[in-house]
């Protein structure tokens, strides 16, 4: 009998166990496509970023001009830049949908995979933030100033920490240079953690919509799931192409078309749309340190989700109370995103505070209590 090289070769064997002969549950839906879409996003971002870095100059006197040069003079530079900028938005859309699927179907009970995923989200947010500073427009400069200033809220070490990150007494050339270094380095760290994320996932196997053990009903990843993923790739590339070619500045900020000016403050300083929900939570707390802790906890709370599981069922597919609350949480997050983009005035302050309280209450009290109630109702029958 002929030896199959993909099953015996040391290198091909790893690829085979990851992408070809991997046993996958037969009933996983399109919601399981977002993991592979995130991988595609990461590849697109690294490749476009590499080409942009070849033409970009990390100097405050030339950064803005170098971005203009990329868009005007470099062959297809405008396309590469637009793909990179909108690819970041698509990356966040995919990761938020990926997290939502994990919450809905109980995938968070794979604790190692879930916690590495939360760390990946943190790294992605950090990468996006430092990347947003690089064009050195008005919102880049003032966004960097405001967000890095948050560290001054920490007692004793705060001011020293801020000056250490700035590399001086204000956001200046040293800040831009180090942010460029971080923006170049972090995607490779994300890539390494993604491999560890997959490693832990393949220890347990994928979850499925029913949230039950599917060992008796598995199919090979290729061709069934691989073709399903390729369909997702085409859909996402089409969406990215429409965004990039027809409405490239839809998700950006008009202020960033103005070169950075430390003497003129924009009327409303805000980060990109994908960080607005956390920014809204930060702004809803009157105390600076409290706001910073709330900002961090808005993401870190995801790590508590496996510990707060009170339901006897894994997936919410047979739990109508939790399903309704899940969609309340989704709506709440959308409201927070909207509030983060609004000026600090009534009624937005009040709405933001109510949405922030309900965001944390959902995770810590309401959903665990609803799950406990569902257990009681089930035990009555």
Swiss-Prot record:
Name recorded for this polypeptide: Cytochrome b
Chain's role: Component of the ubiquinol-cytochrome c reductase complex (complex III or cytochrome b-c1 complex) that is part of the mitochondrial respiratory chain. The b-c1 complex mediates electron transfer from ubiquinol to cytochrome c. Contributes to the generation of a proton gradient across the mitochondrial membrane that is then used for ATP synthesis.
Binding site for heme b b566: 98, 197
Localization (cell): Mitochondrion inner membrane
Keyword Transmembrane helix included in the entry's annotation: yes
Cofactor binding comment, as recorded: Binds 2 heme b groups non-covalently.
Record: residues binding a ubiquinone: 202
Keyword Electron transport: yes
Note: Heme 1 (or BL or b562) is low-potential and absorbs at about 562 nm, and heme 2 (or BH or b566) is high-potential and absorbs at about 566 nm.
Origin superkingdom: Eukaryota
Family membership: Belongs to the cytochrome b family.
Protein's membrane topology: Multi-pass membrane protein
Originating organism: Galeocerdo cuvier
GO annotation, biological process: mitochondrial electron transport, ubiquinol to cytochrome c
GO terms assigned for molecular function: metal ion binding; ubiquinol-cytochrome-c reductase activity
Cofactors: heme b
Residues that span the membrane, as ranges: 34-54, 78-99, 114-134, 179-199, 227-247, 289-309, 321-341, 348-368
Assembly, per entry: The cytochrome bc1 complex contains 3 respiratory subunits (MT-CYB, CYC1 and UQCRFS1), 2 core proteins (UQCRC1 and UQCRC2) and probably 6 low-molecular weight proteins.
């Amino acid at each position: 009998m002929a030896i199959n090289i993909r099953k015996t070769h040391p290198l091909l064997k790893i690829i085979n166990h990851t992408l070809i002969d991997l046993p996958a549950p037969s009933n996983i839906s399109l919601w399981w496509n977002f993991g592979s879409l995130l991988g595609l996003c990461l590849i697109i971002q690294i490749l476009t970023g590499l080409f942009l870095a070849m033409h970009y100059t990390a100097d405050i006197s030339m950064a803005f001009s170098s971005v203009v040069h990329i868009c005007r003079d470099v062959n297809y530079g405008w396309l590469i830049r637009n793909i990179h900028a909108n690819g970041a938005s698509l990356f966040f859309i995919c990761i938020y949908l990926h997290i939502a699927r994990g919450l809905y179907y109980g995938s968070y009970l794979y604790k190692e995979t879930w916690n590495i995923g939360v760390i990946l989200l943190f790294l992605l947010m950090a990468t996006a933030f430092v990347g947003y500073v690089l064009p050195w427009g008005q919102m880049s400069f003032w966004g960097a100033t405001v967000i890095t200033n948050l560290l001054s809220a920490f007692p004793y070490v705060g001011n020293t920490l801020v000056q250490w990150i700035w590399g001086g007494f204000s956001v200046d050339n040293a800040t831009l240079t180090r942010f460029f270094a971080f923006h170049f380095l972090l995607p490779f760290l994300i890539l390494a953690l993604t491999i560890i994320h997959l490693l832990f996932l393949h220890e347990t196997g994928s979850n499925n919509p029913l949230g039950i053990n599917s060992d008796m009903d598995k199919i090979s990843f290729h061709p069934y799931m691989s073709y399903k993923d390729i369909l997702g790739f085409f859909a996402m590339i089409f969406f990215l192409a429409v965004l990039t070619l027809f409405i490239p500045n839809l998700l950006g900020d008009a202020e960033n078309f103005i070169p950075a000016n430390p003497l003129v403050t924009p009327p409303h300083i805000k980060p990109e749309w994908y960080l607005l929900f956390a920014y809204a939570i930060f702004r809803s707390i009157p105390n600076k340190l409290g706001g910073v802790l709330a900002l961090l906890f808005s993401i870190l709370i995801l790590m508590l989700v496996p510990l707060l599981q009170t339901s006897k069922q894994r997936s919410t597919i047979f739990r109508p109370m939790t399903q309704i609350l899940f969609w309340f949480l989704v709506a709440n997050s959308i409201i927070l995103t909207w509030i983060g983009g609004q000026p600090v005035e009534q009624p937005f302050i009040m709405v933001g505070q109510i949405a922030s309280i309900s965001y944390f209450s959902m995770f810590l009290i309401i959903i665990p209590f609803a799950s406990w109630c569902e257990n009681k109702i089930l035990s009555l029958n």
